[in-house]
């Protein structure tokens, strides 16, 4: 699997696959001909940007890599790893399994209640979800962190000396030019309010903001 993400992703990928792939909608998959073989192309990614993920036989991977880099050489295409991907998904406010999501997390804890309708029936775990919908739940918020030290996963969030939540993801944001974090709070957040994050024993002020931090222009 090779992913091409960013505002010029479509233009670059279509140079290898042909124009028909440009009609593929987000979260859809199609067969494409690339480098003389049939592959899968999905209009997916976890960066908050437009892009494609290309699924090819393993032995074709190096050739596809070289072809993509050549196709995007004039458009600033550069190779990046998971750290860059994770920073982009953080800026886009996208929850990640192992950070914001777990086996114990419900859709109501992460602002995804719109994705489930347990009362309509036909849903695996529907009864449990319906019960969870009536119970108190956590809230995901964004934090603008003051100072130069970033908040990391697991750092406590406090208000008036009380622990009210935990940082689930945090990193410096190249787009915003400051440290940001996603936190799970145990109460309804006040957007624009302030909390303190325990960063290695030092309480650091942070401003509560709505997610996402960044939304790509359409």
Model-derived segments and spans:
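Conserved, structured C-terminal
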Residues: 1-218
